[in-house]
A protein has these predicted regions:
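Structural signature of hydrophobic alpha-helical transmembrane segments
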Residues: 59-70, 119-133, 180-193, 240-251, ...
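A generic, well-ordered mixed alpha/beta core segment in the N-terminal half of proteins
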Residues: 107, 111-143
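Alpha-helical transmembrane segments in multipass membrane proteins, preferentially the mid-helix core
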Residues: 138, 171-172, 195-204, 226-235, ...
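Membrane helical hairpin/interfacial module
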Residues: 52-120
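N-terminal amphipathic/basic-hydrophobic helices that include classical n-h-c signal peptides
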Residues: 1-16
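Juxtamembrane helix-loop boundaries in multi-pass membrane proteins
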Residues: 17-42, 61, 83-108, 125-128, ...
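Helix-coil boundary and interhelical linker segments in multi-pass alpha-helical membrane proteins
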Residues: 43-57, 111-123, 169-183, 231-242, ...
Length: 330
C-alpha cells in the first residue's frame, strides 16, 4: 500500500505542488526502519542460541531495509518538489532534529547488509557517519551563535543529532573493526548526553508538551540503552560496571515513561510512538550480552521478551493506521 501511495504521489505531483498540503511522510517516520533495523541486529546476536534467530533477523532486516529505501526515495522526492518544506524543517527549532534519523538509519541498514555484502555495508556506514557528523556540526553549532535558539529546542528529539547519531556511529565502526575510532564517537555521544540531559529534563519540568508531541517522549528511553549497546560493541560484549550503570539508569527512565504513558497517549495512539523503538531494540540487544555473560540472566530474558512484544505492538498499530488510511499526512 505504501508503494502504491508513493507511485500516486509521482503521478499527481503537479496537483500536489499546487496545493498547500503537507508532504505525506514526516521525517520522524524514519523511526520505523530505525526500530526494525535495531531489532534485527539484536536477533542476529542470538544466532548461537536459537537456530531460527538468524531467520528472524534476516526477515526483520529485509523489511527494515525495504522501508528505508522507500522512505529515502520519498525524501529525495521531497527535496526535489517540496524544498521549501525541507528548508522550513531544517530551521525549525524542534523538527530539525529528526533529520538526523536519515544518517542514523543509513548506518543501521549498513550494519544489516554487512552479513551479505561487507563492501556496500562499509560504504553506507561511512556515508552515515560523515553525514551525521556534518549535519550536527552545521545545525547544532548554529545554536551557539545566539538569537536562533529557543527553549522548545530542548525537547526529546534533541537527543538525535549529537547523542543517538554518535552512539550509532560508534557501534557501526566497531562492526567494521575501527574500535579506537568508535570510542571517539562513543565519547562524543556520552558527553553530549550528560550535558543535554539536565537541560532537557528541566524544560519538561517547567513546560508541558502539546499532545501531538508527547509520543516523542519515547526518545528519552534511547540514550542509556543505545549507549550500552554501543559500548558493548566496542568492548567485545563484556558486561562491566559501566554497562550495568547505563542499564540501571535506562530502567529508571523506563519506569518514569511507563508511569507517564497514559498521559502520552491521551489523544490516542499514533506513529510517533516509534520514538520508543530504538531504546526498546537496544534494550533487547544489550540484554543478549547480559545473558551471554551470565549476568542477571532472568532479567535479561524478561527484558528481551518485553522489548519484542512492545515493538510488535508498534508494528500492529502501524498496520492498523495503514489499513485505515491514517498513516500518511493529509
Amino acid at each position: 500500500m505504501a508503494v502504491l501511495h508513493f507511485a500516486q504521489i509521482f503521478q499527481n505531483k503537479d496537483n500536489i505542488m499546487s496545493t498547500t498540503k503537507p508532504f505525506p511522510l514526516p521525517t520522524g517516520y524514519f523511526g520505523i526502519p530505525l526500530g526494525l533495523a535495531a531489532l534485527s541486529l539484536a536477533w542476529f546476536h542470538l544466532e548461537n542460541l536459537f537456530p531460527t534467530a538468524r531467520t528472524v533477523s534476516d526477515v526483520l532486516g529485509i523489511v527494515a531495509s525495504a522501508v528505508w529505501i522507500l522512505f529515502i526515495l520519498m525524501y529525495a522526492y521531497k527535496l526535489r518538489y517540496y524544498f521549501e518544506d525541507v528548508r522550513a524543517e531544517y530551521h525549525c527549532p524542534v523538527r530539525f532534529s529528526f533529520i538526523a534519523l536519515i544518517p542514523i538509519t543509513t548506518m543501521l541498514v549498513g550494519d544489516i547488509i554487512y552479513r551479505w555484502n561487507p563492501l556496500i555495508s562499509e560504504v553506507m556506514i561511512w556515508i552515515g557517519t560523515v553525514g551525521q557528523l556534518l549535519f550536527s556540526s552545521l545545525r547544532i553549532s548554529e545554536l551557539w551563535q545566539g538569537g536562533v535558539f529557543e527553549q522548545k529546542s530542548t525537547r526529546p528529539p534533541f537527543y538525535l543529532p549529537a547523542v543517538a547519531a554518535n552512539f550509532t556511529s560508534a557501534s557501526s565502526l566497531a562492526l567494521l573493526g575501527y574500535h579506537d575510532l568508535g570510542y571517539l564517537f562513543f565519547g562524543a555521544g556520552m558527553v553530549a548526553w550528560i550535558i543535554f540531559e539536565p537541560v532537557l529534563l528541566q524544560h519538561l519540568r517547567i513546560s508541558s508538551l502539546e499532545p501531538p508531541f508527547r509520543a516523542t517522549m519515547g526518545i528519552i528511553l534511547a540514550p542509556a540503552f543505545v549507549g550500552a549497546s554501543a559500548y558493548l560493541s566496542l568492548n567485545h560484549g563484556e558486561v562491566d560496571t559501566l554497562v550495568k550503570i547505563l542499564w540501571g539508569y535506562g530502567f529508571l527512565q523506563l519506569f518514569f515513561l511507563l508511569r507517564l504513558f497514559p498521559w502520552i497517549v491521551e489523544k490516542g495512539l499514533n506513529i510517533g510512538l516509534w520514538g520508543f523503538a530504538f531504546g526498546l531494540a537496544s534494550m533487547a540487544n544489550s540484554a543478549i550480552a547480559f545473558y551471554h555473560g551470565n549476568v542477571l540472566q532472568g532479567v535479561s530474558i524478561f527484558v528481551f521478551v518485553f522489548s519484542n512484544v512492545m515493538i510488535g505492538l508498534l508494528v500492529l498499530i502501524t498496520i492498523y493506521k495503514l489499513t485505515k488510511g491514517q498513516f500518511f499526512l493529509k
